[in-house]
Amino acid sequence: MTSTPQPHPNGHKVSIALEELALPYQLITLNLQKGEQKTPAFLKINPNGRIPAIVDRDEDNFAVFESGACLIYLAEKTGKLMPTDAKGRSRVLQWLMFQMGGIGPMMGQANVFYRYFPEKIQPAIDRYQGESKRLFRVLDGHLADNEYLPGDYSIADIANWAWVRTYKWSGVSVDGMPHLKRWMDAMRSRPAVLKGIEMPPSSINLNTDDEAKAKEFAEQARKLVETGRSGNSSL
């Protein structure tokens, strides 16, 4: 298996899943600032020119792009991290789509307006931080009666946690959400999760409490965002 993640929630979803499933894989890191994700070779893997993507060398170099699709493929390939019965599978997919259609887009936009844009557009910041927090409360309420999102540990937990763990970076508080915090701690206690978020190794820490460091990291990421504003977004 070949994987092209980046130190970004969507990339971490795939690297965590690969570690949890104990699948051997080759990590290929693209230089996004140089536009390596837009080369003809990579566009054959993902026509949208974004990461992550995986190539299954055991299946005639079958390529999968979009992080959620990668997670589903890996789960179905191995028969792990997602039930095979219709109801169990549906529970996992519901919470996976909750992340893909809600948590990810809302937190992603909160990051952009709160951390990256040189101009501060407060209504946009308030909108995306507020919606992210509302979605956090949905998770907190559901986790009051469930150890993991679908009941048992799954790709849905991996997908949501990869984003929720960066709440500080988005400027969103998790105060008053004890069930969400319990789940976050449970996820972080898993060795494969800890290893997955180190793939690829990076000096960027989206959970830092050091505001000076946060500004430094934001400046590094801002260049990619500016590229995205010109129509060449990478993530």
Features from the language model and the residues they span:
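Acidic/histidine-enriched, glycine/proline-rich intrinsically disordered or flexible terminal extensions
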Residues: P200-L235
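GST-like fold's C-terminal all-alpha helical module
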Residues: L74, L96-P191, S233-L235
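GST-like domain detector, emphasizing the conserved glutathione-binding G-site
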Residues: M1-D126, G130, T227-L235
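Short secondary-structure boundary/hinge segments and terminal tails
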Residues: G35-E36, D185, I204-L206
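A short, terminal or domain-edge coil/loop segment
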Residues: G88-R89, V138-D145, K168, E198-A214
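Generic structural signal for individual residues within well-ordered alpha-helical segments
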Residues: L43, S90-L93, A159, K181, ...
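Domain-wide signal for the mature, well-folded portions of proteins, strongly enriched
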Residues: P5-S15, E19-A22, Q26, N31, ...
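Short, structured secondary-structure boundary patches
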Residues: I45-I51, G196-P200, E216-E219
